[in-house]
């Protein structure tokens, strides 16, 4: 246990367009080299494409996509007597959201469309309908945890 006091979480201001903290956090994750305006342009462009294609509120679709990508359990390595076990542990709420955002961005960047706006829009729409690589990543994570359920008693 650390002897110093717990570090406060930084308050993230809501984004200018949707007044939503989750979108602002996503923009911060998407941003590279401090270029926030570029990150905002990408995500707002992706939201416009989602709205045009699905004729639905893009914020609602985005939140549904995030919920579909959030992992419930993950595995952590734990060394016990010379052997390393993959121990399944439950994921905290804030880490779930962070992982979901990270995976959405990672698998968006790996898609085949031409611009990042199109890639992100495609991955958001796929994730909202339980398809796509980000959802597959969550399923793989859950499978790993399920396969290593026997080591759950090593949790710390």
From Swiss-Prot:
Gene Ontology terms: biological process: translation
CDD domains noted in UniProt: uS7_Bacteria
What's a single GO MF annotation on this record?
structural constituent of ribosome
**Which keywords does the record carry?**
Ribonucleoprotein, Ribosomal protein, RNA-binding, rRNA-binding, tRNA-binding
- Highest rank taxon of the organism: Bacteria
Instruction: Enumerate the Pfam families for this protein.
Output: Ribosomal_S7 (PF00177)
The record's PROSITE patterns line, in alphabetical order, gives: RIBOSOMAL_S7
Transmembrane spans: none
The GO cellular component terms are: small ribosomal subunit
Listed NCBIfam families = rpsG_bact
HAMAP family, alphabetically? Ribosomal_uS7_B
Under the subunit heading, UniProt states: Part of the 30S ribosomal subunit. Contacts proteins S9 and S11.
- What family is this protein classified in? Belongs to the universal ribosomal protein uS7 family.
What's the stated role of this polypeptide?
Answer: One of the primary rRNA binding proteins, it binds directly to 16S rRNA where it nucleates assembly of the head domain of the 30S subunit. Is located at the subunit interface close to the decoding center, probably blocks exit of the E-site tRNA.
The molecule here is called Small ribosomal subunit protein uS7
Gene, per the UniProt record: rpsG
């Amino acid at each position: 246990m650390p002897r110093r006091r717990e570090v406060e979480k930084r308050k993230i201001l809501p984004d200018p367009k949707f007044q939503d903290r989750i979108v602002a956090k996503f923009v911060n994750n998407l941003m590279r080299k401090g270029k926030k305006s570029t990150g905002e342009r990408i995500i707002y462009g992706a939201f416009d494409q989602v709205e045009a294609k699905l004729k639905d509120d893009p914020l609602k679709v985005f939140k549904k996509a995030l919920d579909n990508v959030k992992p419930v359990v993950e595995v952590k390595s734990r060394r016990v007597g010379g052997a390393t076990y993959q121990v399944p542990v439950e994921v905290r709420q804030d880490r779930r959201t962070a992982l979901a955002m990270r995976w959405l961005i990672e698998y968006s960047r790996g898609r085949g469309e031409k611009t990042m706006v199109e890639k992100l829009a495609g991955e958001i729409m796929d994730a909202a309908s339980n398809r796509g690589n980000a959802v597959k990543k969550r399923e793989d994570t859950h499978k790993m945890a399920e396969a290593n359920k026997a080591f759950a008693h090593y949790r710390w």
